[in-house]
Curated annotation (Swiss-Prot):
Record organism: Schizosaccharomyces pombe (strain 972 / ATCC 24843) (Fission yeast)
EC number(s) from the headed UniProt entry: 3.4.16.5
UniProt protein name: Carboxypeptidase Y
Regions of compositional bias (Basic residues) in chain numbering: 144-170
UniProt subcellular location: Vacuole
Length: 1002
């Protein structure tokens, strides 16, 4: 099951990657809503047609066409699944065309992946040859990695359809469609009487020489298929007219037999015969031609040689665009290898064949790395030597070498089936994708799968799944019609819309992704819901300039702050009285960071209760991604909490602003009170907005700019904080000049002193391993059966492959697949326990609000009109935004190693880093956090790893255990869940204060 699920992830990421990488034209992307049958019937065709005619169409219907134009298929025949009994999905106009368009990128991509695998990993002998050919194509200069053999199937792989009418043929490049049974090109048989040479000769019999000259277009007879020892072989013709087909040499020779030399000269476009496929020990190999005309096809060398056999040298010179024959695919020990050509190909397109483009042709003839066509003695699909029954069968071979009637393989200069070149649609890919890290996609993450799954059948398998699910295309949109859904109530239904706002804005590709997982018995939304801090958003109220308290209103008494270094960013500060809410008596500021007029980040600043002129400044960030930092304000470390019964603020004596000024920032866009038409769905981009905000904030409030500055956060802030800190440190090396309120400011320098990450996700490759351990070996006892824990741990092998693929390639579709698989396999089983995933000691009390009723109370409080008026906010409050969460996932942001590497970078720069974790949390548990800090590569890794965990007793009572070396520290806190300040407010405040003053591990 795991193998099949992983295969689905890979297959679907290929389709998604085709969209991301531009393999599908923009007009094929379609609309943005997937419609189930009940939704479709609810609105009806008239509504959809109206939306189609509007400026923002809901769908893009297929135009009607006449019956004569509709594709005809014999009764009982189905294009994608011969076993599928219902024609409903295939009767829709344009279904085949649309499905083909949807699948074609996957086909192209998978064939490219297969070719890449064969190209990158070759035998040691071929590696040695490549090292001696430094001027070969750029593709050979790419980094090499040795892995197990990859058995990508070539074009003559028979697959499971090799017998009977079900056998598939490759489509002609000028047609995107796939050949089905009734339209597959027919093979032409070749009868023995058509041959002009005898099929066999007795020993000593003299072979007649071929004609010395042939008229244009005349077909050359093939030589005998077998010769007895000592028999004399006739020489080939001395001259051929343009376009004349050259006969192939004998397929087998006995020891000592003399091989005839090839022709001395060929006309442009003439097809050169291939050399013998096998030679006996001591047999002399004929040399290749000394000269070839432009565009002439060079014959490949023999596929196998016996020990000691002498290899003929390649031609000394080739014309521009001429195709060079590949060297032998296999050599015996001590065998002499022919030298490479002394002059390399010019990048020109030659006459006749359209598929041989020289060194850049990566689809068919790839030189020494080409395993799709010439694979030597191990190639069981194409050239098998004298025992090859599939390719060279002697005089009775009717499938491949058919003499003058063979139209499938040797067509000469007019061959369009085998030599396609620049018109091949499979080659029309962005150049930057041809020589990038994409070639490592399957190698690192899916190598074992590719070895066991025939590449030729992947697209067909994908079609079968679509048929099974009832996926149809309505216009350019895959529509799931639930008409044929199973009636068994024990089977969970597929995704439905109804009032589920979490799925309402999924793109068609994302929806198809989730449907596939659901069909395999996986509920991906469980992982999203539990790991992303989602809460159903309230209906957003658009900004209204009629509100007198709106920040942007003309009557506002606030201030706009601009900086020369950030022309697209503006800070709007509300000069109001948020302290009127009774949250705290200290000075407070609220406002927005505006980004290009369509993104607005909300902030709330609280001055220190102690000494605001000298106390440090702390930026607090909650995670998610997509969860508001105001959750931290009112539930964890802010000046007040919200009573769940009265919705009144209650004073918090252990607030982190007791000895520091604190900024609570809602980021990224559409988190909390932040809003905008545009989206930021990756950590790196979010970091640029945060850096701009800090510059603008300290420009507006220079009294805080010189103070020590720290960044703290939890959960997905394990991604945010390392990246944001790195962004600040890089910019601190430069100079920025600002304009604030009309006067010039001095060079801005953000005085970053340290970072703190609580129960964060930073290194998934290490952390995901400990879900099984935490489930059965936590200090609070097992929460699952040992069998379930073993099952989770067993799934880690596949999970680790996927995460490693993301780490090594950074390729978004691989990272997406890793997130989907690992979140469901490793975290999904926890949902059956009914416990709080953020604190395994408790039951989940409020599923809609992160299992905590406190978060629901916060949302209700902040959506009161008088509260919003005091804050000057423009939208209703969203505790957690699932759309942002899913957006980060489908950008591949979850599983990248960038953030772990950022921790290394800031440690090496001397910035102190504290990783702390409550030991009752499951989602980002202390076991995983302790393990990744031990495994982190940095200058002090050994000393940190060897350091012992020591008790931490802030008030004479042990509250945790920790260790440190130089500027890196780790602290485990007892009796605390995911939100440490919520469970241990006093200990967490002491942790912050002692960390800031340097006494935490003293």
């Amino acid at each position: 099951m795991l193998m099949k699920q992983t295969f689905l992830y890979f297959l679907l990421t290929c389709v998604v990657s085709a969209q991301f990488n531009g393999y599908v034209p923009p007009e094929q992307n379609g609309g943005d809503i997937v419609v189930p049958k009940d939704f479709y019937e609810k609105f009806g065709e008239d509504f959809i047609r109206e939306q189609e005619e509007s400026s923002a169409p809901l769908m893009n219907p297929v135009p009607e066409r006449d019956e004569a134009e509709a594709p005809h298929h014999p009764k009982g025949h189905h294009e994608f699944n011969d076993d599928f009994e219902d024609d409903t999905a295939l009767e829709h106009p344009g279904f085949k065309d649309k499905l083909d368009s949807f699948l074609q990128p996957a086909r192209d991509f998978l064939h490219t992946v297969s070719d890449r695998l064969d190209n990158i990993f070759d035998d040691d002998e071929d590696e040695h040859v490549r090292e001696k050919r430094p001027h070969d194509s750029a593709d050979e200069d790419a980094p090499r990695r040795k892995h197990g053999k990859c058995k990508g199937k070539g074009k003559h792989h028979k697959g499971k359809h090799a017998k009977g009418k079900g056998k598939k043929s490759h489509p002609k490049p000028e047609d995107d469609s796939v050949f089905f049974d009734d339209e597959r090109p027919k093979h032409h048989e070749f009868d023995d009487e058509d041959r002009e040479f005898p099929a066999h000769h007795e020993p000593g019999e003299h072979m007649p020489p071929p004609p010395m000259h042939h008229k244009p277009g005349e077909h050359m007879p093939p030589p005998p298929m077998h010769h007895e020892p000592g028999e004399h072989m006739p020489p080939p013709p001395m001259h051929h007219e343009p376009g004349e087909h050259m006969p192939p040499p004998p397929m087998h020779h006995e020891p000592g037999e003399h091989m005839p030399p090839p022709p001395m000269h060929h006309e442009p476009g003439e097809h050169m015969p291939p050399p013998p496929m096998h030679h006996e020990p001591g047999e002399h190999m004929p040399p290749p031609p000394m000269h070839h005309e432009p565009g002439e096809h060079m014959p490949p060398p023999p596929m196998h040689h016996e020990p000691g056999e002498h290899m003929p040298p390649p031609p000394m010179h080739h014309e521009p665009g001429e195709h060079m024959p590949p060297p032998p695919m296999h050599h015996e020990p001590g065998e002499h290898m022919p030298p490479p050509p002394f002059k390399h190909h010019e990048l020109e397109e030659h006459e006749g064949p359209e598929h041989h483009r020289g060194p850049e042709d990566k689809e068919h003839h790839k030189g020494p790395k080409d395993k799709e066509h010439h694979k030597g003695p191990k190639d069981k699909e194409h050239h098998k030597g004298p025992k090859d029954k599939e390719h060279h069968k002697g005089p009775k071979d009717k499938e491949h070498h058919k003499g003058p009637k063979d139209k499938e393989h040797h067509k000469g200069p007019k061959d369009k089936e085998h030599h396609q070149g620049p018109k091949e649609k499979h080659n029309e890919r962005p150049e930057q994708n041809m020589q990038s890290s994409h070639e490592l996609l399957v190698i690192e993450a899916f190598a074992d799968l590719i070895n066991s799954v025939p590449v030729e059948e992947i697209a067909e398998e994908f079609s079968r799944f679509l048929d099974t699910l009832g996926i149809e295309y309505y216009g350019n949109i895959p529509v799931h019609i639930q008409e044929n859904a199973p009636k068994d109530s024990s089977i969970p239904p597929l995704f439905e819309f109804d009032d589920d706002l979490e799925l309402s804005d999924l793109t068609p590709e994302q929806f198809a992704y989730l449907e596939m997982l659901k069909a395999e018995g996986i509920d991906p939304m469980t992982a999203f819901r539990d790991q992303s801090h989602p809460a159903k958003p309230s209906n957003a109220q658009p900004a209204d300039s009629s509100r007198p308290y709106a920040v942007f209103s003309q009557e506002e008494n606030g201030e706009h702050v601009n900086l020369k270094a950030f022309p697209d960013h503006t800070l709007r500060v509300k000069d109001s009285k948020p302290e009127s809410l009774g949250i705290d008596t200290v000075k407070q500021y609220t406002g927005y960071l505006d980004v290009e007029d369509d993104r607005h980040l909300f902030f709330w600043f609280f001055e220190s209760r102690n000494d605001p002129e000298n106390d440090p400044v702390v930026l607090w960030l909650n995670g998610g991604p997509g969860c508001s930092s105001l959750t931290g304000l009112f539930m964890e470390l802010g000046p007040s909490s919200i009573n769940i019964e009265t919705l009144k603020p209650e004073y918090n004596p252990h607030s982190w602003n007791s000895n520091a000024s604190v900024i609570f920032l809602d980021q990224p866009i559409n988190t909390g009170f932040s809003n905008g038409d545009d989206s930021v769905l990756d950590t790196v981009t979010a970091g640029k907005d945060v850096y701009a905000f800090l510059n603008l904030f300290f420009a507006k409030f220079p009294q805080y700019a010189h103070l020590d500055f720290h960044i703290a956060g939890e959960s997905y802030a394990g991604h945010y904080i390392p990246q944001f800190a790195k962004e600040i440190m890089e910019h601190n090396q430069g100079a920025n000049f600002f304009v604030a309120s009309g006067y010039e400011m001095e060079k801005q320098y953000i005085n970053l002193k340290s970072v703190l990450i609580g129960n964060g996700l930073t290194d998934p490759l290490v952390q995901y391993y400990f879900y099984g351990k935490m489930a059965c070996e936590s200090p609070y006892g097992p929460i699952m059966s040992q069998e379930e824990c073993d099952r989770i741990t067993g799934a880690y092998d596949t999970c680790a492959k996927l995460i490693t693929g993301c780490y090594q390639t950074g390729f978004t579709p691989v990272c997406i697949g890793a997130s989907l698989y690992c979140n469901n396999a490793m975290i999904g089983p926890f949902t059956k326990t009914g416990l709080n995933i953020y604190d395994i000691r408790e039951e989940c009390r409020d599923q809609e609000h992160l299992c905590y009723p406190e978060t629901g109370a916060i949302e209700s409080y902040l959506n009161q009109e008088f509260v919003q008026e005091a804050l000057g906010v423009e939208y209703d409050y969203k505790g957690c935004n699932t759309e942002v969460n899913i957006g980060f996932l489908f950008k591949g942001d979850w599983m990248r190693k960038t953030f772990r590497d950022d921790v290394t970078a800031i440690l090496e720069a001397g910035l102190p880093v504290l990783i702390y974790a409550g030991d009752a949390d499951y989602i980002c548990n202390y076991m995983g956090n302790e393990a990744w800090t031990d495994a982190l590569e940095w200058a002090g890794q050994r000393e940190f790893y060897e350091a012992e965990l020591k008790p931490w007793s802030p008030n004479g009572k042990e509250a945790g255990r920790g260790k440190s070396f130089k500027n890196f520290g780790y602290l485990r806190l007892y009796e605390a869940g995911h939100m440490v300040p919520f469970n241990q407010p006093e200990a967490s405040l002491e942790m912050l204060n002692s960390w800031i003053d340097g006494s935490l591990f003293a």
